[in-house]
């Protein structure tokens, strides 16, 4: 059976390495795209709509990447996520801030199948808290939300039009490109779903938790293609997603058909309808006498179906030695010796 998850992973891998669609030498280089995005970021800073991070203020205009994970096509460039997008983490207000009706408050259980499912255990906060204490994490339609506390990491979803305003908790960050938002959000979702960058920066905490900090999120290394190539990548990935979804459905249909067929065959078998009866066959009662001369035959009358002529019913103990096992103490377990099977090994 085809592994659709591995197939999609391969598509994403090709996409982020610049191998899914051909490069066009006539495309405007990604370096020009990056400068246009930076210019928009500066405009937003001057207008007071966003703040310049302390790290960005100290950085030079030319980023240096000593540890880039792979080589890019000539027309691509590396950048940090915060070079092209506003990145902010959420937080959890006091219990008194939650209300029955108010501003939708997204929790990580609402990120289901890479979409926002706010109908699942919805929670709301007051307008005052949304526009006050939690104003930095106010979402907009089209923002990308990524969880930063796992396992699992890699839950990503785009804020839908059904949530014109919302907020979220501290287990996630929002990603809002400064320019070309729709196309870059789609591209960033493809890149981050590939998981290699997320896995490379994740740190393991207590009790098996896996985390990414806000700073790590802002500094994630992003390979940027030319804008036209970004569009081609998104279009190609979308085509493959449709194909993979169709394959998944076909596989599910086949599995359901196999399960139904197996059940039907077993049903026919136990009702004596799978193969024809032969009147010359020795009756089943003679077989039981040879297995256990002391067997007790059962009355067939309580069965909901007619037992074929030549068949007979009996209890399991008449033809099998049925025994139960005992629990083994932990001190009795050995690395070698007689195999001991538990229910989970069957």
Task: List the model feature ranges, each with a label.
Residues 152, 165-173, 186, 205-225:
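A short glycine-rich beta-alpha junction/loop motif
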Residues 16, 76-77, 184, 188, ...:
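Amphipathic alpha-helical segments
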Residues 1-25, 31-32, 42, 50, ...:
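Short amphipathic coiled-coil heptad-repeat segments
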Residues 97, 104, 191-222:
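Specificity-determining recognition surfaces
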Residues 10, 19, 64-91, 227, ...:
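Non-catalytic DNA-recognition/assembly elements of restriction-modification systems
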Residues 46, 63, 77-116, 130-134, ...:
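Low-complexity, Lys/Gly-biased intrinsically disordered segments
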Residues 92-93, 112-125, 144-147, 151-168, ...:
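Short, ligand-facing micro-motifs at secondary-structure edges
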Residues 139-140:
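Short, well-ordered loop/turn sites that connect or cap secondary structure elements
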């Amino acid at each position: 059976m085809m592994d659709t998850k591995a197939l999609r992973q391969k598509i994403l891998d090709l996409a982020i390495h610049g191998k899914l669609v051909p490069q066009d030498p006539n495309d405007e280089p990604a370096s020009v795209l990056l400068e246009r995005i930076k210019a928009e970021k500066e405009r937003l800073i001057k207008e007071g709509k966003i703040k310049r991070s302390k790290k960005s203020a100290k950085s030079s205009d030319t980023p240096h990447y000593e540890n880039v994970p792979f080589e890019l096509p000539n027309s691509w460039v590396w950048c940090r996520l915060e070079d092209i997008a506003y990145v902010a983490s959420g937080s959890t207000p006091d219990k008194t801030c939650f209300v029955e009706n108010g501003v939708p408050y997204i929790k990580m259980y609402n990120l289901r199948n890479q979409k926002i499912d706010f109908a699942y255990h919805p929670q709301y906060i007051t307008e005052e808290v949304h526009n006050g204490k939690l104003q930095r994490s106010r979402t907009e339609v089209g923002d990308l939300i990524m969880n930063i506390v796992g396992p699992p990491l890699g839950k990503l979803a785009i804020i839908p039009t059904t949530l014109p305003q919302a907020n979220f908790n501290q287990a996630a960050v929002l990603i809002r490109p400064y320019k070309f938002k729709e196309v870059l959000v789609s591209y960033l979702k493809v890149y981050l779903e590939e998981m290699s960058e997320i896995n490379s920066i994740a740190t393991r905490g207590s009790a098996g938790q896996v985390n990414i900090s806000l700073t790590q999120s802002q500094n994630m290394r992003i390979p940027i293609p030319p804008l036209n190539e970004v569009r081609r990548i998104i279009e190609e990935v979308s085509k493959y997603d449709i194909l993979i979804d169709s394959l998944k459905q076909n596989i599910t249909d086949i599995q359901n058909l196999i399960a139904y067929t197996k059940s039907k065959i077993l049903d026919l078998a136990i009702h004596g309808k799978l193969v024809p009866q032969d009147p010359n066959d020795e009756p089943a009662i003679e077989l039981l006498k040879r297995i256990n001369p002391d067997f007790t035959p059962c009355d067939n009358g309580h069965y909901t179906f007619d037992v074929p002529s030549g068949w007979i019913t009996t209890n399991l103990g008449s033809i099998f030695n049925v025994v139960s096992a005992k629990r083994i103490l932990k001190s009795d377990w050995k690395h070698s010796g007689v195999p001991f099977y538990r229910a989970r090994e069957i």
